[in-house]
Amino acid sequence: AFFYNRGTCEYLHDAGRSGVPAKGLEMNQEVIIVRGNHTLKGDVRVSGAKNSALKLMAASILGQGETILHNVPLISDIELMSEVLARLGATVVREGHTLRINTADVDSCETPYELVSKMRASISVLGPLIGRFGEARVAMPGGCQIGARKIDMHLVGLEALGVAFDVDHGVLAATTPNGLRGTHVYLEFPSVGATENMLMAAVTAEGHTAIENAACEPEIEDLANMLNAMGARVS
């Protein structure tokens, strides 16, 4: 619990240990009391957002050369996504907080289960793999079946673009029998992941695609900006 008041800041451990809890507190509840009236100043370096970085890394699959991402956070999920891309055939080089991703030699559309199962965001490679190859084999996070996790909206949106799916032992196999075609899709919920996968597949589809009730989080805007920089038209 956090109590905000004027003055100094103090941390109370086991506020109710005396036998009489403070007003509004339960016995043995830890409390931070913050008392202000001091000017806040200084500088802080803000790390890049993981949710944006992972999806921009996935979007690099759509390119045929080098993608450079700056201000990438140094966290384990970024390393895992780098490994996923490398297994697909990409070259990933880290220089501090900068990633250089060359996808010219990506020649596989199947992600390794042992990596994908460790990271929920790995489902985001589905859309760009379909966009580049017209097919994909992506192990679902945790090997779950459809419906066990919130990926159904991803599939509904991609199916509207012309993708056909089959599931075998936790592996999602996607094909495009008649190619990708532009469409109009209404998402029952503004799912961030579904919006991202649809965007990355739709930019290679024939015709225009409209996504109604799409998510509009900052990472969606970052992804749209990158796709536009790669030659797409997203608005």
For the regions a language model picked out, list residue spans one by one.
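Extreme N-terminal basic, low-complexity initiation segments
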Residues: 2-6
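Structural preference for solvent-exposed beta-strand-turn elements
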Residues: 7-13, 22-235
